[in-house]
């Protein structure tokens, strides 16, 4: 059996990924499929941390007429809903999981403590980071880059609704070309919509590679872990 390339990874899931084809809310079948994909790599001994977005319920920047700080905090609460849903799906298939939130809510999750998170990973528990960084004006992409640096993840697995990074929007331009490899500077200079510039810069500064791939295709998380050439590889 092929060996995984990585020992510890951070998986970034957008809120939209949890909504499935519905585009809003939570799709149980989609969440269960993601949980089974995660179980495939934990069974190989890979330590998995997850950052979830909240765009299937709310995006802070879309709160028209609303105070930006308030809107961002609402988005953080949406990520907690998603984290609990994913935790439930994982634990239903007997994957020990802990949710840690950047804003304390001890009745439902642990507060984020880096040492505790690392200890959970060492015990082969999945750790889900929710509520972003706990601060407004920072995206969940930036949270993923920050947490990956803090827990010393070897790679960020950026699961998207498209199968990689394209030179233009493939939903608009049928001739859009998928890019197999990019540097962080390519992403920043070309304005490619991978992560926001803060998150990309943080990955560049800490030399954390990023694998961008489609989540819709079955077993793609496992394929990336085993080194199959899918999606887009971003590196220094």
Swiss-Prot record:
Residues 20-25 are annotated as: Involved in allosteric activation by GTP. It catalyses: UMP + ATP = UDP + ADP. InterPro entries: AceGlu_kinase-like_sf, Asp/Glu/Uridylate_kinase, Uridylate_kinase, Uridylate_kinase_bac. Keywords: Allosteric enzyme, ATP-binding, Cytoplasm, Kinase, Nucleotide-binding, Pyrimidine biosynthesis, Transferase. ATP binds at residues 12-15, 55, 59, 161, 166, 169. GO terms for cellular component: cytoplasm. Its EC number is 2.7.4.22. One of its GO terms (biological process) is UDP biosynthetic process. GO terms for molecular function: ATP binding; UMP kinase activity. UMP binds at residues 54, 72, 133-140. Its main location: cytoplasm. It is found in: Cytoplasm. It comes from the Bacteria. Pathway: Pyrimidine metabolism; CTP biosynthesis via de novo pathway; UDP from UMP (UMPK route): step 1/1. Allosterically activated by GTP. Inhibited by UTP. Homohexamer. Belongs to the UMP kinase family. Catalyzes the reversible phosphorylation of UMP to UDP. NCBIfam families: pyrH_bact (TIGR02075). This is Uridylate kinase. It comes from Alkaliphilus metalliredigens (strain QYMF). The gene is pyrH.
């Amino acid at each position: 059996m092929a060996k995984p390339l990585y020992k510890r990874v951070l998986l970034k899931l957008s809120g939209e990924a949890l909504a499935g084809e519905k585009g809003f809310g939570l799709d149980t079948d989609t969440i269960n499929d993601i949980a089974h994909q995660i179980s495939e790599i934990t069974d190989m001994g890979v330590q998995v941390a997850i950052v979830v977005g909240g765009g299937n319920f709310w995006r802070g920047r879309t709160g028209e007429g609303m105070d930006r700080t308030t809107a961002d905090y609402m988005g953080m609460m949406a990520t907690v809903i998603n984290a609990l849903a994913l935790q439930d799906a994982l634990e239903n298939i007997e994957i020990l999981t802990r949710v840690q939130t950047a804003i304390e809510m001890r009745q439902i999750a642990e507060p984020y403590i880096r040492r505790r998170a690392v200890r959970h990973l060492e015990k082969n528990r999945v750790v889900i980071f929710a509520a972003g960084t706990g601060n407004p004006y920072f995206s969940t992409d930036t949270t993923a880059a920050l947490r990956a640096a803090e827990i010393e993840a070897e790679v960020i697995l950026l699961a998207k609704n498209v199968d990689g990074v394209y030179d233009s929007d493939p939903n608009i331009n049928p001739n859009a070309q998928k890019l197999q490899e990019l540097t962080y500077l390519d992403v920043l200079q070309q304005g490619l919509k991978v992560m926001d510039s803060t998150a990309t810069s943080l990955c560049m500064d800490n030399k954390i590679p990023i694998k961008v791939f489609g989540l819709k295709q079955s077993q793609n998380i496992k394929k990336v872990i085993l080194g199959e050439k899918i999606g887009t590889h971003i590196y220094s």
